[in-house]
């Protein structure tokens, strides 16, 4: 199971709390997923009040507040400080977005905000791209976890750049890595784990599915399968065929 900032979590599935048809379905989906962490947006969910916060606490798993919707370092830092006070945790999923069309991370502001928040005692989980230089700068800024996107948030496209994600894993073998955003199908989640990633964070794929509870269970099984596959040392892909049946012992006719 993954370890983040010295804390071991019970599942490599990290699940968001937004967009569900109802609070009851959200809670049932969390139970079906056996998620290890619940992510919460202070800005997007703040209007739900104490009932929502009580529901999150009743899930009984660690909470990872995020700064979704922030477009500047100042916004992200202010939101982070409010989240730490409300949820009583130093953990923070840091999002600083360049524009609302792509929801692409603003990597320059992201690194700056990560440095400010790390210096203030936050344990930062940065939502970033798979760019090696950016990820290196985030580690230099104090981050001990990296959360590269698979594809744009909510797109459901899966892993747009498996090569880049594989390279990131190889370059930082000892850093906890989480594929965050873009997951649409259980096969996408399994692929991330097959690449050797420590966890997967998703939300829309479950919350907006026709049956969120069934999809949550499917994601849990896929992540388990991908993790087992990675640990089994799978064969390398090759361009040419390789016979699976040995010639030894075959009858010689004629």
Swiss-Prot record:
InterPro entries: Aldolase_TIM, Thiazole_synthase_ThiG, ThiG. It is an enzyme of class 2 (transferase). GO terms for cellular component: cytoplasm. The keyword DNA repair does not apply. Belongs to the ThiG family. PANTHER family: THIAZOLE SYNTHASE (PTHR34266:SF2). Catalyzes the rearrangement of 1-deoxy-D-xylulose 5-phosphate (DXP) to produce the thiazole phosphate moiety of thiamine. Sulfur is provided by the thiocarboxylate moiety of the carrier protein ThiS. In vitro, sulfur can be provided by H(2)S. This is Thiazole synthase.
């Amino acid at each position: 199971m993954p370890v983040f900032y010295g804390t071991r979590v019970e599942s490599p599935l990290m699940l968001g709390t937004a967009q569900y048809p109802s609070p009851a379905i959200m809670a049932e989906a969390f139970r079906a997923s056996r998620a290890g962490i619940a992510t919460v947006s202070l800005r997007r969910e703040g209007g739900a009040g104490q009932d929502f916060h009580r529901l999150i606490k009743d899930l009984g798993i660690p909470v990872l507040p995020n700064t979704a919707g922030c477009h500047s370092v100042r916004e992200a830092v202010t939101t982070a400080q409010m989240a730490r006070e409300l949820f009583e945790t130093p953990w923070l999923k840091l999002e600083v977005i360049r524009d609302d069309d792509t929801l692409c991370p603003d990597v320059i502001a992201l690194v700056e905000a990560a440095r400010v928040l790390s210096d203030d005692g936050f344990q930062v989980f940065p939502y970033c791209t798979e760019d090696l230089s950016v990820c290196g700068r985030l580690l230099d800024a104090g981050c001990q976890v990296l959360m590269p996107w698979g594809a744009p948030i909510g797109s459901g496209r899966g892993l747009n750049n498996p090569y880049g994600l594989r390279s990131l894993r190889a370059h930082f073998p000892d850093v906890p890595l989480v594929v965050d955003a873009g997951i649409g199908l259980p096969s996408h989640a399994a692929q991330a784990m097959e690449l050797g990633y420590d966890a997967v964070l998703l939300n829309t794929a479950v919350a907006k599915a026709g049956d969120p509870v069934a999809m949550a269970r499917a994601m849990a099984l896929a992540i388990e399968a991908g993790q087992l596959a990675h640990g089994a040392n799978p064969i390398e892909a090759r361009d040419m065929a390789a016979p699976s049946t040995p010639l030894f012992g075959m009858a010689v006719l004629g």
